[in-house]
From Swiss-Prot:
One of the Pfam families matching this protein, by short name: Pkinase
Protein's recorded name: Serine/threonine-protein kinase mos
Gene3D superfamilies: Phosphorylase Kinase, domain 1, Transferase(Phosphotransferase) domain 1
Matching SUPFAM superfamilies: Protein kinase-like (PK-like)
Encoding gene, per UniProt annotation: MOS
Superkingdom assignment: Eukaryota
Family as reported in the entry's similarity comment: Belongs to the protein kinase superfamily. Ser/Thr protein kinase family.
Positions that bind ATP: 53-61, 74
Active-site residues (renumbered): 187 (proton acceptor)
Length: 194
């Protein structure tokens, strides 16, 4: 949900003329996170997707468990209409990995490699912020899905003035922090605020 103010946050470097893109003598694609992100590699055997929370132009977000904790998993589509934009979006989102703020979702782990069964450009595991978005609160909708037996119930009624002020202050605090780090949120909308 955030983009670094620099033009491209991808660690990819274009090769010089005559060099192979993935290194001399290498015929297989080896994709790794940059060294400063190596600590957050995904342990795939510990990840269990539970249900789809939402999807958009660049990918899908799932509720999942990772090492026993409830998390949100964002998978960026490989076959998106704009592959370069998808890749830049993935790497830009990882720019928040170093940030620590109460109003910014933390990244737990990430990977550019995925199991063969998944057709994704990359996967980001984030802290789980809950089932209910600001969109649900504003419009008083009770569920993310139509099934009232799901655990996706949003327990809020309509948004009061006091709640609106609290939400507004939290949103502004998070945005001010991101802006102080030269990061701009490019998809700010009630459905993306938990």
């Amino acid at each position: 949900p955030s983009v670094n103010a620099r033009p491209c946050s991808s660690p990819l470097v274009c090769p010089a003329k005559g060099e192979k893109f993935f290194g001399v003598g290498s015929t297989s694609r080896i994709r790794r996170l940059p060294p400063h992100l190596a600590w957050c590699s995904i342990d795939w055997e510990q990840l269990c997707l539970l249900n789809l929370l939402g999807s958009g132009g660049f990918g899908s977000v799932y509720k999942a468990t990772y090492h026993g904790a409830t998390v949100a998993v964002k998978q960026v589509n490989r076959c998106s209409k704009n592959h370069l934009a998808s890749r830049q979006s993935f790497w830009a989102e990882l720019n928040v990995v170093r940030l620590d703020h109460n109003n910014v979702v933390r990244i737990v782990a990430a990977s550019t490699c995925t199991p063969a069964s998944q057709d994704s450009l990359g996967t980001i595991i984030m802290e789980y912020a809950g089932n209910c978005t600001l969109h649900h609160v504003i419009y008083g909708t009770g569920y993310l899905t139509g099934n009232s037996n799901d655990d996706l119930k949003c327990d809020h009624g309509f948004l009061s003035t006091a709640q609106a002020i609290i939400y507004s202050c939290d949103i502004v605090a998070g945005l001010m922090f991101l802006h102080s780090q030269l990061i701009v949120h490019l998809d700010l909308k009630p459905a993306n605020i938990f």
